[in-house]
Amino acid sequence: MGALTIVAKYMIVAQIEVNGGVDKSDIIGALFSQTEGLLGKDMDLRELQMMGRIGRIEVDIQEKDGKTKAKIYIPSNLDRYETALVAALIESIERVGPYPATVKVLEIRDLREEKRKKIVERAKELIKMIEEEILPDTKEIIEKLKEDVAKAEVVEYGPEKLPAGPDVDKSDWIIVVEGRADVVNLVKHGYRNVIALEGISRGVPQTIIDLSKRKSITLFIDGDKGGEMVLKELMKVAHIDYVARAPPGKEVEQLTAKEIAKALRNKVTLEEWLAQQKAGAEKTEAAAPPPQQPTAPPAAPSQQPIAEVPQEIVKRLGDMQGTLEAELYDTNWSLIKRIAVRELPDELANSTDSIYAILMDGIVTQRIVDLAAKKGVKIIITARVGPLTKVPEDLKIVTFEQLQKLA
């Protein structure tokens, strides 16, 4: 196929079959002569070619057994409607010289689309070249610039002047981290709804406690024992919705954008976290040799509350398992309300009902214990018990397993 004489938008590709031996000039001549005047002067092939609306017609010919088969290529600078009309026009050819002939259009290529694909592929190559040739010093400058911008965006929040991102008030959920460097790193990577505890040696800041009452909290801890200590202290006084953790041995301030995104994507609810920690502890205890002086077992539930739990409630334990729901009862063991376990802290804090007992498929946390005690709850029947630092004497906590064994 020869070079094009115009900058074409489309390429008409057709196939012609002639019942006899002919050459290229015969086929091209038939195209011009047999289409002349069919669609008027404006669509005459010679006129279109003279005006540069179609390019040079190329023919790729093959002759076999006295018959001729050829591919016809017509570059077009017309719009798609006119190009389609020209394609249909050449299909009207019935003879080449003295021989019968048929023409069929095989395709109309969009040459601009092919150019676009080549441009995109070349752009990919150029981007790769740019990325490979950026000097390490340049990358360091960019990282330093990002960090400086992030530091400038860090604000002081609350009476304690805690380091925070600029969007703590705007966002419905916030990320709580340990220190200022953690805040700077998260802001640098686009997380602006972050605030720091600034250590827990002097207790959890009241600002964090207040925020936990009105916003969803994700605690993002370091991947070491220190992170676990922060979690234990915070869960005593504040409501934590989710826990995210840095990879083992890494601190939040050291994480890359990809590591931060992965850790936050893999966050779990506080209940799931505590269950995982308990399962890990039980596995470790099972693998370890018996201690010389075994620690005291968890206090056995009082027989008095066990005895007063109605059999209908005991029978409900099987139905409750796996629901992640909580049921609230009055002193007559009449059902007051059934809610999701995650809604229990808010219900205990705001409900005006007199609640005597709670049946819940979840983990009892110190926050739930504190709210239940304040509400006057006397019995909590639960699937699991998390780490507790203080339980009032008049509040009895019993697990499903204990109740089923003793009932």
From Swiss-Prot:
Residues 288-300 have a biased composition (Pro residues). GO terms for molecular function: DNA-directed RNA polymerase activity; metal ion binding; poly(A) binding. Residues 172-248 form the Toprim domain. Binds two Mg(2+) per subunit. Mg(2+) 2 binds at D222, D224. Residues 279-304 are annotated as: Disordered. Its EC number is 2.7.7.101. Keywords: DNA replication, DNA-directed RNA polymerase, Exosome, Magnesium, Metal-binding, Nucleotidyltransferase, Primosome, Transcription, Transferase. SMART domains: TOPRIM. Mg(2+) 1 binds at E178, D222. SUPFAM superfamilies: DNA primase core (SSF56731). Its cofactor is Mg(2+). GO terms for cellular component: cytoplasm; DNA-directed RNA polymerase complex; exosome (RNase complex); primosome complex. GO terms for biological process: DNA replication, synthesis of primer. It catalyses: ssDNA + n NTP = ssDNA/pppN(pN)n-1 hybrid + (n-1) diphosphate. InterPro entries: DnaG_primase (IPR050219), Primase_DnaG_arc (IPR020607), TOPRIM_DnaG/twinkle (IPR034154), TOPRIM_dom (IPR006171). The keyword Nucleotidyltransferase applies. NCBIfam families: PRK04031.1-1 (NF003108). Forms a ternary complex with MCM helicase and DNA. Component of the archaeal exosome complex. RNA polymerase that catalyzes the synthesis of short RNA molecules used as primers for DNA polymerase during DNA replication. Also part of the exosome, which is a complex involved in RNA degradation. Acts as a poly(A)-binding protein that enhances the interaction between heteromeric, adenine-rich transcripts and the exosome. Belongs to the archaeal DnaG primase family. This is DNA primase DnaG. It comes from Pyrobaculum calidifontis (strain DSM 21063 / JCM 11548 / VA1). The lineage of its organism: Archaea, Thermoproteota, Thermoprotei, Thermoproteales, Thermoproteaceae. The gene is dnaG.
